[in-house]
Amino acid sequence: MMPEIKFIIAGDFSQLLPVKDRIEDCNYKDSMALHELCDGNRLQLTKCRRSDATLYNMLLPENINNIKRKDFKNKMTDRHIAFTNKKRIEINKIMMDQTIRNKKIKALELKALDYDPNSQDVRLCTGMPVIARKNSKQLHIFNNETYTIKEIRRKEDEITVEDGGRREHTVPIPEFTKIFNVAYCITVHKSQGATFDEAYTIHEFNQYDERLKYVALSRATDINLINII
């Protein structure tokens, strides 16, 4: 035992519950384990530092179920959130094709993983967003972190991606689809923890429960960035 260790645990209990949790209807917020780890201390923040007050108040528990699609814009942007992997794959294909067409370049084409139904055929070029599917200690890649393709070197058979801190990571082309998904569109679950300071579009909104709505909408720093189609 090391009683001198102090835990600082931060989180949002309104976000999505653990996937395939082994315990049903667990009250994590008021659990004895969390109480013990934090020495009985809990600070409840009352001011949102991520978004504007309008969006914050809209997402309060007493208001969130009154939200309607018409409360937001309905544009197709360059960034997307979807509920299902089927829709995610569909939107990513649309965006990849559009990007390649607009840039008028020859894309690097890679096939989907035959063992993973959530993988997809990709057409890659520089500037495309990708998200890590898993950790890679060797390559210093972290699961669910987003990256941008900086360079594709076909002769060397490798791709360099850049993270948010502008650190570069080089990945062998044959390993790329094992490590990354294209990330024009990501699922609501994958978006947890992200902050969007650019316009984005939410898909399949009619399938969202209260927690899914909360996560998808609270990514924005400004209510005017949100589009629902």
Which positions does each model-derived feature cover?
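Conserved ATP-binding/catalytic motifs of P-loop helicase motor domains
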Residues: 1-229
